[in-house]
Design a protein with these regions (language model features):
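C-terminal cap of metal-dependent C-N hydrolases
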Residues: 20-22, 381-436
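Active-site gating loops and adjacent loop-to-helix segments of metal-dependent hydrolytic enzymes
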Residues: 83-113, 161-176, 235-265, 288, ...
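Glycine-enriched alpha-helix->loop->beta-strand junction motifs that scaffold or abut catalytic
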Residues: 154-156, 220-225, 261-264, 281-290, ...
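Alpha-helical scaffold segments that flank or form the walls of functional sites
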Residues: 85-155, 179-193
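Metal-coordinating catalytic core of metallo-dependent amide/deamination hydrolases
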Residues: 141-271
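N-terminal metal-binding scaffold of metallo-dependent hydrolase/deaminase domains
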Residues: 1-54, 66
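His/Asp/Glu-enriched, well-ordered alpha-helical/loop segment
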Residues: 258-265, 307-396
């Protein structure tokens, strides 16, 4: 089995940084090494020490002077929306009805689903993303195509077919029973196969009847180790419509709460307009509020109050995500940049150490997967991104005046995109250069 020895400036986080000067929250090696074998990081530290453990047969790839970090993690994205990203002029509910739902009906075709699933995952790799929590369409074939493509690439993914039995067009609705049956079959076929993990996925309360929400709760009780993902409190019209459909609920969050869908593996996309009671309910259950800045800005949904949610008496667990195709970029670097701006509009700041922690270890913690991904710790899965802070002329001229690691990270998140991603390693193997036909030459 080939052993790969990477050399470069290695950076990983030990905990959430408390500010731009909190270097105790990270481990940085100016001349670092990572030894990869069998899809895992088997040694990490100063290059000289790791090289001594590698043996003469290790293949060396020298990435100096670039930064080597854990692969970026996207905690909310829609695979079937690749061909409606950048669709003009609608708020959430109109956008779904005008663009998204008609597009997702195409995923009843297994060939189409397979094509888009492969393109979607390859695009993430180009952007340095190594794990995604993904929504497939309502069709079982869509989820099968996604998991098959991810398994072939040995990518760790969390995904599920959406459950939706109302307020959607013909060809995009299931039933409570068919949703249960399809989900059970997909769990049996894919959960734990290789690096694939299943998420029970009621799209949102508007598109599920109470009977289907009961089914989602039953699935969670039957499979308490699974993730659950849905949408919550994204848009004022969405909230009002939800409460019309569930008049007995105290608020939007209570709809999910009464069906047993809150918990530490529950991922709630958006969470922009939460009441204090709702935020308390999420916090007490350990549920995750997923920040989707490019989508929230593009659809005019509102501003996620990231710092307030984290600092409140009962803090929320948070994650960061692209939400493509409502989101406007597959890049977590671009998403971090837009997140910074959203937080600034609330009169706060998110420092670059905090941004990169969130997109790596922080998102891994949100997925309850930090023992496997999100760090460069020995024993972790070898999902890695190599970033070049001088990837473009404008980045190079700015870098001439940089004097700290934090400034370099801020440059990467402000001006960086897929061009800054030198290489993406998935399960210990180079993945981006293979896509681009530019496999890194060993030295």
């Amino acid at each position: 089995m080939t052993r790969l020895l990477l050399r470069g400036r290695t950076l990983t986080f030990l905990r959430r940084p408390e500010g731009v000067g909190d270097v105790a929250a990270l481990r940085y090696e100016e001349d670092g090494g990572l030894l990869l074998e069998g899809g895992r990081i088997v040694a990490a530290g100063p290059y000289a020490e790791v090289e001594a453990k590698a043996g003469a047969d290790a293949e060396i790839v020298d990435h100096r002077p670039n930064l080597i970090l854990p692969g970026l993690i996207d905690t909310h994205a829609h695979m079937p929306q690749m061909q409606v990203i950048a669709s003009y002029g609608a708020e959430l509910l109109d956008w779904l009805n005008k663009y998204t739902f008609p597009e997702e009906t195409r995923f009843s075709d297994p060939d189409h689903a397979r094509r888009i699933a492969g393109l979607f995952l390859d695009e993430l790799v180009r952007q340095g993303t190594t794990t995604v929590a993904a929504y497939c369409s309502v069709h079982r074939a869509s989820a099968e195509a996604f998991f098959s493509a991810a398994h072939a690439r040995d990518m760790l993914t969390v995904a599920g077919k959406v459950m939706m039995d109302r307020n959607a067009p013909d060809g995009l609705r299931d039933t409570p029973q068919s949703a249960y049956d399809d989900t059970k079959a997909l769990i049996a076929a894919w959960h734990g196969k290789g690096r694939q993990l299943y998420a029970i996925t009621p799209r949102f309360a508007i598109t599920s009847t109470p009977e289907q929400m009961e089914v989602a709760g039953a699935l969670m009780r039957e499979h308490p180790d699974l993730h659950m993902q849905t949408h919550l409190s994204e848009n004022h019209a969405e909230i009002a419509f939800t409460l019309e459909l569930y008049p007995e609920a105290r608020d939007y969050t209570d709809v999910y709460e009464r069906y047993g869908l809150l918990g530490r593996r529950a991922l709630f996309g958006h969470c922009i307009h939460l009441s204090e009671r709702e935020a308390d309910a999420l916090a007490e259950s350990g549920s995750v509020a997923v920040f989707c800045p490019t989508s929230n800005l593009f659809l005019g949904s509102g501003l996620f109050d990231y710092q307030r949610y984290r600092r409140r008496g009962r803090p929320l667990r948070t994650a960061l995500a692209t939400d493509v195709g409502g989101g406007t970029n597959y890049s977590m670097l671009r998403t971090m940049d837009e997140g910074y701006k959203v937080i600034a509009l609330s009169g706060e700041k998110l420092d670059p150490l905090g941004s990169f922690w969130q997109a790596t270890r922080g998102n891994a913690e949100a997925l309850s997967l930090v023992e496997r991904i999100g760090t460069l710790d020995e024993g972790s899965d070898a999902d890695i991104v190599v970033l070049d802070s001088g990837a473009t002329p404008s980045m190079r001229i700015r870098r001439e005046r940089i004097t700290s690691l934090a400034e370099e990270l801020f440059l990467l998140q402000t001006l960086g995109d897929d061009r800054a991603v030198v290489e993406t390693y998935v399960s210990g193997r180079p993945a981006k250069s293979v896509l681009d036909g530019l496999a890194a030459a060993p030295v």
